[in-house]
């Protein structure tokens, strides 16, 4: 008995010689494409194992080769408990961007990455200091005192020039300069300052104290002009020469010329 090709495709011989009709699901399974073994292995190869070093700790991660370094950070957050913003990932000594893919950077199976934890305290120190209204007010007050002290400093310099030049300066000039300096010192003492304003105030206090010391020294020199022994000796010598020379600052002439003059007068007589 002859069967056409269609009928032959609907029957199959089972072990033992039994002829049975082929089931639909078996027939449909014959038409399903078989999975390419190469593509299956390629899909398996998409997952790689990398080692991430964090100080003395090492973490093994199984991750897709197409993942990014940001994905690695997320995986490390779960293992270490650190914040992703604190982590820096280095591969081959170069810090990698979060959006960069592992495969594009050359990361392969068994590659090693290094994680560095950023010092958050250092990052906070680098931020510009917050200037409050109170700080601005303190800085302005210290600057105002600085301007007044500049004027008083010029006055002290003028007093020093006068004293060094031998000018007799009234005592009240030194007392007035000292009083004005003390007023500015009291102003600084009443300024509540922090940060840069505090440093500036401290420097200005030291400056005023130095000027006060200079005024006291000038006043002492003016009250006792011979306090400088070298200058006193020079003035005394000049006065002695003036007395001995009878109206001349030069020392008196030697006795021998006087004898000659006497002899001339005798000859004249």
UniProtKB/Swiss-Prot annotation:
Q: Which keywords annotate this record? A: Chaperone
The cross-references to Pfam families, in alphabetical order and at most eight, read: BAG, ubiquitin
Ranges of residues in domain Ubiquitin-like: 46-122
- According to the record, the residues making up region (Disordered) are 1-40, 241-269
The protein's superkingdom reads Eukaryota
Protein induction: By cold, by salicylic acid (SA), by abscisic acid (ABA) and by pathogen B.cinerea attack.
Phenotype upon changing residue 179 to G: Abolishes interaction with HSP70-1
Give a brief account of the tissues where this protein occurs: Detected in stems, leaves, flowers and roots.
CDD domains with a match to the protein in the record? Ubl_AtBAG1_like (cd17054)
Q: Which InterPro entries match?
A: BAG_chaperone_regulator (IPR039773), BAG_dom_sf (IPR036533), BAG_domain (IPR003103), Ubiquitin-like_dom (IPR000626), Ubiquitin-like_domsf (IPR029071)
State the name under which the record lists this protein. Answer: BAG family molecular chaperone regulator 4
| Source species | Arabidopsis thaliana
